Amino acid sequence: MKIIKLITIFTMMATLMXXVANGEPIPPNAVKSLQG
């Protein structure tokens, strides 16, 4: 379970970084899932 959670967090971070790099607004649901 921990490995799956780490992969999920890593994927979310990568998605957020890509969105910021492209200058796109960050999806609120992505932020919510990061916060728990």
UniProtKB/Swiss-Prot annotation:
Its main location: secreted. Residues 1-23 form the signal peptide. Keywords: Amidation, Secreted, Signal. The keyword Ligase does not apply. The modification Glutamine amide is found at residue 35. GO terms for cellular component: extracellular region. It is found in: Secreted. It comes from the Eukaryota. This is U14-myrmicitoxin-Tb1a. It comes from Tetramorium bicarinatum. The lineage of its organism: Eukaryota, Metazoa, Ecdysozoa, Arthropoda, Hexapoda.
